[in-house]
Amino acid sequence: MSKRITKTSAIHDKHSIITRDTESGFEYDSDSESDVENVFPNIRVQRIRDKLYQDEDEDEDEQVDDEDEEDEEDKEDEEDDADNFENENEEEVDDYIDGDGMRNFDMGESIEVGDVDSTSERKNGKIKKLTSRQLQKEQKRIKRTGVCYLSRIPPYMKPATLRSILSRFGKIDRLFLKPEDSAIYHKRVKYGGNKKKNFTEGWVEFVNKKDAKMCASTLNANKLGGRKTSYYYDDVINMKYLSGFKWFDLTQQIAKENEVRQAKLSLELSQQQKLNKTFVNNVEKSKLVSTIQRKRKERDPEHESDSHIRRSFKQRKVTSTRADADEELKARAQPDRKLSDVLSKVF
């Protein structure tokens, strides 16, 4: 049985608080709040609403304070960067760090090869120049790296699978796999072969050269192992650690090969253009000659035989120094006696 709440006097001690219900007009002591809520459910609903509104206001205030603090920190960082650039007396390097155009060169995955180096920072869409300190740090990082060459890759192995296998020995930075020739691929698919991508060779860059040496010495000419149910359990991989070889050497070699291929292509195109131009000129000349002959025939049909245009070509003499050749050809191949006499007198 719920207790009956009566009007209380305004006199109360410091531990009790007089509360008034706006709807019923009753005043009650805060010590019996649970009883009041049971009797007047509207009071409980109102309290819950007030508490929710209060919590939302506090959350909004905290978010505003956090945003203000973040804005202040960003402004302070920008001011510090500006001060550092103004106060720097060190020489700035004009060269830019090349973007990792070949980063994660997984040919099977669109050559993951394409992120900008972590040392170069972007600001307003432009790459900032590196200071000498940053350049030294980058050079030290490059010096610690090691590159391994993969002369044989298990058939139809994906770059992600190879990366997961090699990452057991250490952290891998970039991976480049060379796909097979497109003609071989289309021929295999044409005759009902496997449609998966196959890679012939590759290069892998380790962050630490010690890991690269360990990986090459462990996996070279050995089975990959792992679970017996694995597709590549019995496959063999050939690896070799390239001493003193860095990733930019590979990029330079690839760029050089691309330049040579482009030069050959441009040379072939120029030769073909010359042939086409010569062919067009000959066709025009033949049309011109046929037109001249037709007009002459219309003017004077009696001299049809004379209207034929005769052309003369310069013929070169055939010479030979072979033992089974004719004596006439051998005689032509001998040097002039007068010239030999003059040379003998001089020398």
Swiss-Prot record:
Taxonomically, the superkingdom here is: Eukaryota
Q: Which cysteines are joined by disulfide bonds?
A: none
Record's compositionally biased regions (Basic and acidic residues): 10-23, 298-309, 328-340
What sequence ranges are listed for the domain RRM?
146-236
Q: Which residues form the signal peptide?
A: none
Report the main location listed first in the record. Answer: nucleus
Q: Which InterPro entries match?
A: ABT1/Esf2, ABT1/ESF2_RRM, Nucleotide-bd_a/b_plait_sf, RBD_domain_sf
* GO CC annotation: nucleolus
Q: Does the keyword RNA-binding feature in the UniProt annotation?
A: yes
Chain intervals for the UniProt region annotation (Disordered) = 1-101, 290-347
Compositional bias of kind Acidic residues: 24-36, 55-98
| UniProt KW keywords | Nucleus, Ribosome biogenesis, RNA-binding, rRNA processing
A GO MF annotation of the entry reads: RNA binding
- GO biological process terms on file: endonucleolytic cleavage in 5'-ETS of tricistronic rRNA transcript (SSU-rRNA, 5.8S rRNA, LSU-rRNA); endonucleolytic cleavage in ITS1 to separate SSU-rRNA from 5.8S rRNA and LSU-rRNA from tricistronic rRNA transcript (SSU-rRNA, 5.8S rRNA, LSU-rRNA); endonucleolytic cleavage to generate mature 5'-end of SSU-rRNA from (SSU-rRNA, 5.8S rRNA, LSU-rRNA); small-subunit processome assembly
Q: What subcellular locations does the record give?
A: Nucleus, Nucleolus
Q: Where is the composition biased (Basic residues)?
A: 310-319
* Family statement: Belongs to the ESF2/ABP1 family.
State what this protein does. Answer: Involved in the small subunit (SSU) processome assembly and function, and in the 18S rRNA synthesis. Required for the early cleavages at sites A0, A1 and A2.
Official protein name in the record: Pre-rRNA-processing protein ESF2
